[in-house]
Amino acid sequence: MPQMAPIGWLSLFIIFSIAFVIFNMMNYYSYTPSMPKSELINKTQSTNSLNWKW
């Protein structure tokens, strides 16, 4: 049964690690949460109430 050289295992590990990181980055950055407009309006009003008018 043939055996792989250590550099073969290293290159295989590096290739799969890069593929795993790219896959996770694509999944992370493709997610866009949807916020209803009513919540967006309430959020802007709540931040405006924090600005004190001295």
Swiss-Prot record:
Single Gene Ontology BP annotation: proton motive force-driven ATP synthesis
Membrane topology: Single-pass membrane protein
InterPro entries named among the record's database cross-references: ATP8_metazoa
Subcellular location: Mitochondrion membrane
Keywords: ATP synthesis, CF(0), Hydrogen ion transport, Ion transport, Membrane, Mitochondrion, Transmembrane, Transmembrane helix, Transport
Pfam family, one: ATP-synt_8
GO CC term (a single one): mitochondrial membrane
Molecular functions per Gene Ontology: proton transmembrane transporter activity
Membrane-spanning intervals of the chain: 6-26
Quaternary structure annotation from Swiss-Prot or TrEMBL: F-type ATPases have 2 components, CF(1) - the catalytic core - and CF(0) - the membrane proton channel.
Function: Mitochondrial membrane ATP synthase (F(1)F(0) ATP synthase or Complex V) produces ATP from ADP in the presence of a proton gradient across the membrane which is generated by electron transport complexes of the respiratory chain. F-type ATPases consist of two structural domains, F(1) - containing the extramembraneous catalytic core and F(0) - containing the membrane proton channel, linked together by a central stalk and a peripheral stalk. During catalysis, ATP synthesis in the catalytic domain of F(1) is coupled via a rotary mechanism of the central stalk subunits to proton translocation.
Family according to the record: Belongs to the ATPase protein 8 family.
Protein name: ATP synthase protein 8
Source species of the chain: Cochliomyia hominivorax
Taxonomic lineage from the root: Eukaryota, Metazoa, Ecdysozoa, Arthropoda, Hexapoda
Gene of this entry: MT-ATP8
